[in-house]
Amino acid sequence: MIKRFAQCLREYKWTALVSPVCMIGEVAMEVTIPLVMADLYDYGIAVGNMTVVWQKALQLLICAIVSLMFGVMSANYASKAATGFARNLRHDMYYRVQDFSFSNIDKFSSASIVTRLTSDVANIQMAFQMMIRMAIRCPMMLILAMVSSMRISPKLSTVYFIAIPILAAVLLGIVPLVFKIFDRVFKTYDRLNTVVQENVHGIRVVKSFVREDKEVSKFKTISGSIYDDFCKAEHILALNAPVMQICVYACILTISWVGAKMVVASGNNAALGLTTGELSSMFTYTTQILSSLMMLSMVFVMVIMSQAPLRRCYEILQEEPNLTSPENAVEEVPDGSIDFENVSFRYSRKAKRPALQDVNLHIPSGATVGILGSTGSSKSTLVQLIPRLYDVTEGSVKVGGIDVKDYDLEVLRDNVAMVLQKNTLFSGSIKENLRWGNANATDEELIHACKLACADEFITSFPDGYDTHIEQGGSNVSGGQKQRLCIARALLKKPKILILDDSTSAVDTHTDAMIRKAFKEEIPGTTKLIIAQRISSIQDSNIIIVMENGQVACVGDHETLMKNSDFYRGIYESQQKGSED
């Protein structure tokens, strides 16, 4: 894990190394200052030697300035390294998510991915920034201050060997308790993000069903759970401070009592025992030693807090995409013919029954294919295997006579355009959204595609036309308008295969008929697969596939199915009766 995260330093590697080096310089100066202070008192103030006073005062000033410079440099480099590390980590995770297949994404909820890319990375950044400074400062301060105090008085320094184990024992007792709590906190954050995202995306539904109070209550419950867990963690961590203070005060009192007796006994003579200046230095070293332990405990706490985010981010980085392009991949799709050969598919190995079973189909290039079936009959699953959004569990899917697994993924998906059930538009102008289909499309091509999708009429009715701004998720256009924009975007790809997954359900029958007519006249060479609930949307198709319980129930054109399929005929008659009513 450490090796993988270290790769995120990249161009900030040297910056991350310079910060601890500067910190060593700062600590060295801080440890030197008490020694200079002792000499200032013992050899200057105590004996009235102003030359020594001025010399030591100048040394103190130099030490303070150098310490300040090193401290500022260390903080600056640490900030740059931590910010750069977080940026690279976030980029690596985001790029990895872009390579995920649908089955990879199914392992993580969208809310969990958002949390990992935002708050988890922010927590890791703070921990990293503290570590590259304090993880060096604390041990260095502890060691140098201990050595300096041992040189002054080994007898007084023994008090540290009592205080340090006590603090270490408290810390070791706190760590496992707090780790469990913080691990639970970050999982709860995922639930909180899920609630927020669902509420924001479905705000119209929430308001139409007057569920505001219910949503507020749900949010309050989860938020309260996070609050309770944080309070538990803080209560446990709070034990660290009083234990630390007790140890500090106990050490200072012990050194004051024993040290004062040593100063009096020696007559303030260093050769015979201890001087007043050395005793004052011992007080400073006591504070430095125990405060370094306190800071070290804070580092441990921060490391504990970052363990859960580190593990969660590592899961993203280590998740291998299930779908990759093979070596020597096919770089060209010959035509739009499609073959399903003994295809079975399960969304997971644990699934009790397959979503698709024993599917055998041949669709010639340029054909118009209608797909019909009840809810849950795996119509969408069937077409998602064509651009290899999932891999089949058994059998094979072929496009242009070649197994989809043999294609370069980009090449295959560039030649297959899908308009999904859930239409997605992005914030930006209509032009920017359309150019997702073809970044280099001219304005004339945009207009032509929109005319085929019957979208040009309503676009030109907007004051800004094709420059009209689309809100996030397309919230400022109707469902039918959104569908037509998505169809136009797909047409701009000029694909060999066009898949419409119930993509005209929100448009009226007249517009639906106009779109189908435009497809027939303008893109006759493109294989068109149309999933629909209305038979009127697909009855003029060359082939109609009826799905039932993940299997192909029957195949044929409209006339054939009306004669041979009771299921198809029943749907047709019920829809005809409904339209008459």
Enumerate the predicted regions with their spans.
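Helix-loop-helix
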Residues: 49-55, 148-162, 232-312, 316-317
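Membrane-integrated ABC transporters
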Residues: 1-30, 37, 45-60, 66, ...
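An intracellular "coupling" helix at the cytosolic face of ABC transporter transmembrane type-1 domains
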Residues: 11-13, 77, 99-103, 119-132, ...
